[in-house]
Amino acid sequence: MTARQIVISIPEKVLLAEKTDEESFAREMRMLAAVKLYELGRLSSGRAADLADMFRIEFLMALGRYKIFPFESELKDLEGGNA
């Protein structure tokens, strides 16, 4: 899969307030973007997982941390090996 790089300027104050380093903050931003785009229906769970740099099942399981619950049938399909 080819990837494109997008550069976003983050004020130093934000990193200090979050008490995190650039790499961790970037990883969290990718996850948050993936979750929101999935929630809005703009990305499928597979594409959102790609954005978050995760396997699809990992992404679906992680959604609960953000109070987003994927369709039960989607999880059952994955557990049954129909992904």
Predicted regions span which residues?
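Small, basic N-terminal interaction modules of short regulatory proteins
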Residues: M1-A83
